[in-house]
Amino acid sequence: MKSILEQLSSITVVVADTGDLDAIKKFQPRDATTNPSLILAAAKNPDYIKLIDQALESSRKSLPAGFSESELIKETIDQVSVFFGKEILNLISGRVSTEVDARLSFDTEATVTKARKLINHYKSFGINKERILIKIASTWEGIKAAEILEKEGIKCNLTLLFNFCQAVACANAKITLISPFVGRILDWHKAKTGKDNFAGCEDPGVISVTKIYNYFKEKGFKTEVMGASFRNIDEIKELAGCDLLTIAPKFLDELNREEGELIKKLDEDTQSQSSIDYKFDEKDFRLSMLEDQMASEKLSEGITGFSKAIEELEELLLKRLSEINNQKLISTT
């Protein structure tokens, strides 16, 4: 009998949520997603030290004479993300998501500028922008930035998405793909209610993604829905049939080892028509987020967490730069 993973792959695009190249080789997904935390974890792996060194050297060459150490590290942050993305694209047939610096989440102009720069880095390697999804936090400013980028033909993946308002705002902006989170919503409800068991369709994260998916299909939105941030494989199975699901290697492994019948839970062909067309301007969006304690807290927490990961990656790069400079000094004495 086919594994649950094989069955899932026949009805949903399975995406690897990792920067670990070995895991991507093992599971051979169509697409892959990365974020600052995943890039940091991969960068800490001694197996990828050569890639880090290549990114540092490439950054040196791309900067004008007289650049500062801080300018070099800032440039290398972008290069590291692209170098990992390039290596991932060598292993998959589809797209990779590369995230804009989370510290720009409330700056539309800076986000647009950074996204264009990332795309140009990929272009320098001969990689078509059709294979790249620029990952941006689902703030109002992030959605507006993505709307600008989409009009330029730069496809975006709006992440840290925790409620219906964020999703609809993205769809109305004609964003290519959204990543509504599942597990982090579950975490919040567990902490607030003290209830530990939200089984199957009672899982609040599953309910959120299901609502978004059904509404998008009812209204004919082209924005793809990719469930993300899972805490167990039951959440994944409850969303079988979703456009895409991005899954961590440990859960891909579990799904690959499990057998049994997988039931398709989401189906775009069986949706009833809703009479309500939701629209959110900036005022409505901000009010909706303010009224949704879970979404507000989790969005803030996510941006803070990704920002800290970038800062830690900067420290790692500084340490490696110092090691390289010391090696060069020793070799010349």
Swiss-Prot record:
The active site is at K135. Its EC number is 2.2.1.2. It catalyses: D-sedoheptulose 7-phosphate + D-glyceraldehyde 3-phosphate = D-erythrose 4-phosphate + beta-D-fructose 6-phosphate. GO terms for molecular function: transaldolase activity. It comes from the Bacteria. GO terms for biological process: carbohydrate metabolic process; pentose-phosphate shunt. One of its GO terms (cellular component) is cytoplasm. Pathway: Carbohydrate degradation; pentose phosphate pathway; D-glyceraldehyde 3-phosphate and beta-D-fructose 6-phosphate from D-ribose 5-phosphate and D-xylulose 5-phosphate (non-oxidative stage): step 2/3. It is an enzyme of class 2 (transferase). Keywords: Cytoplasm, Pentose shunt, Schiff base, Transferase. It is found in: Cytoplasm. Its main location: cytoplasm. Belongs to the transaldolase family. Type 1 subfamily. Transaldolase is important for the balance of metabolites in the pentose-phosphate pathway. NCBIfam families: talAB. PANTHER family: TRANSALDOLASE (PTHR10683:SF18). Homodimer. This is Transaldolase. It comes from Prochlorococcus marinus subsp. pastoris (strain CCMP1986 / NIES-2087 / MED4).
